[in-house]
């Protein structure tokens, strides 16, 4: 990821038009739980689930975006998804548009798309639906896990200019029943997605595929990490910080009064001394 992408925490929001196209493939008959582990300001999840009776929940690392999502009525946890816990097989719809980046370590760095999928796929109930928005090469990176845990997998190309810019595709999958999980059937086909991007169908309202979302109760996300913003605010108000400021931060002294000699005469004197020295 480029530095500009890292500065915005890998945030590449899905265009609203594409979220509405995704919505056209989803069918629900009763209220259900939907989770977005990288919810941003909440727009994508709201548009994807509009008028379906979904109970929305999400996680967002950026404080401002988390507040924006919460203001839209989404149950939002401010923090890292890796420090959040959700009971296994809790939600019927997992909408996942993770950061497009790699781990920053000395060796064996995984793609973030795979890390997020590994952490979150267990939240989906049997026959629940995964909506996975990623760059096309990431489908190959996640192929074995996807094929082992999901069936009825379909991949579509996105056509919005911003989506084309990042080679984005959307993958739909249905969580396998427990006794069918483990065998990565169809992984080879997913591995080839990155090499045949132009052959994929474009996601539009005309696509005939439909994914039925089973009912479920509202999901609960538990944050197990530290409240970093609250800690930072408390630190600024602490006695220790006030004492440290007195030692580390020097007060600037203001100098007032008239110069000893008028400025233009000082200049003349300096020039004269330089001439005499030469």
What are these regions (language model features)?
Residues 85-93:
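A short acidic, Gly/Pro-enriched loop at the edge of an enzyme's catalytic core
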Residues 1-32, 43-46, 267-269:
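S-adenosyl-L-methionine
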Residues 103-174:
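Conserved Class I SAM-dependent methyltransferase catalytic core
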Residues 165-249:
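Flexible, glycine-/basic-rich loop-and-beta segments that form/coincide
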Residues 40:
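Conserved glycine-rich SAM-binding loop
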Residues 69-70:
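Conserved SAM-binding loop
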Residues 55-60:
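Conserved SAM-binding motif I beta-strand of class I
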Residues 73-81:
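Conserved SAM-binding strand-loop segment of SAM-dependent methyltransferases
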């Amino acid at each position: 990821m480029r530095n500009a992408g890292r500065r915005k925490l890998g945030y590449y929001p899905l265009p609203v038009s594409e979220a509405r196209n995704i919505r056209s493939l989803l069918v629900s008959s009763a209220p259900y739980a939907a989770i977005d582990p990288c919810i941003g300001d909440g727009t994508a999840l709201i548009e994807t689930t509009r008028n379906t009776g979904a109970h929305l929940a999400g996680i967002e690392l950026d404080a401002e975006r988390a507040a924006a999502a919460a203001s839209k009525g989404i149950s939002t946890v401010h923090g890292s998804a890796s420090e959040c816990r959700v009971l296994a097989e809790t939600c019927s719809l997992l909408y996942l548009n993770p950061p497009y980046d790699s781990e920053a370590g000395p060796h064996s760095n995984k793609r973030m798309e795979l890390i997020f999928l590994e952490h979150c796929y267990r939240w989906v109930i049997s026959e629940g639906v995964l909506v996975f928005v990623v760059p096309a090469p990431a489908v190959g990176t996640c192929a074995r896990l996807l094929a082992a845990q999901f069936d009825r997998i379909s991949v579509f190309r996105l056509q919005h200019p911003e989506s084309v810019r990042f080679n984005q595709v959307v993958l739909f999958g249905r969580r396998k029943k427990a006794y069918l999980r483990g065998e990565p059937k169809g992984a080879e086909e997913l591995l080839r997605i990155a090499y045949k991007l132009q052959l994929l169908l474009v996601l539009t309202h005309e696509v005939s595929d439909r994914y039925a979302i089973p009912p479920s109760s509202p999901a609960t996300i538990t944050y197990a990490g530290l409240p970093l913003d609250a800690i930072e605010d408390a630190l600024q108000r602490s006695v220790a910080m006030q004492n440290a400021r007195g030692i580390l931060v020097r007060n600037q002294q203001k100098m007032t009064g008239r110069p000893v000699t008028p400025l233009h005469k000082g200049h003349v004197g300096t020039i004269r001394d330089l001439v005499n020295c030469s």
